[in-house]
A protein has these predicted regions:
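A short, N-terminal "cap"/entry segment at the start of jelly-roll beta-barrel domains
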Residues: 1-29, 64
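Glycine- and acidic-residue-biased ligand/ion/polar-headgroup-sensing regions
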Residues: 50-62
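Ligand-binding loop in jelly-roll beta-barrel domains
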Residues: 82-101
Length: 101
């Protein structure tokens, strides 16, 4: 069996003008990534081909879906269905898990 203990918050850093992403697991359309955004950084509008969950490890982010927006803070989880256009704005230096299944 394979076991690996990781310190999630230490896997990525909040670097100025750089979105940092580390792929933890990936298989075809599915993934489990950790992403770091500096305050005011934006991940531009996009969609996912599979259902997605975002779990905030640290900081505060805002996810925009057309006319709706959700603010997520440390410890909060947002799940959404595939094919929805959205963008992400970091309201504070933030780290979050991106889970696509």
């Amino acid at each position: 069996m394979f076991y690996n203990v990781l310190k999630a918050k230490k896997l990525v850093n909040n670097d100025e003008n750089k979105i940092e992403k580390k792929i933890l697991l990936q298989d075809k359309e599915s993934c489990f990534d950790i992403i770091a955004l500096e305050k005011n950084e934006i991940i531009g509008e996009h969609s996912s081909a599979v259902d997605t969950a975002v779990y905030v490890l640290d900081g505060k982010i805002e996810i925009h879906f057309e006319a709706e927006k959700y603010v997520l803070e440390k410890g909060e989880l947002l799940m959404f269905k595939k094919d929805h256009q959205h963008k992400v704005l970091a309201l504070k230096d933030s780290k979050f898990f991106l889970i696509k299944v």
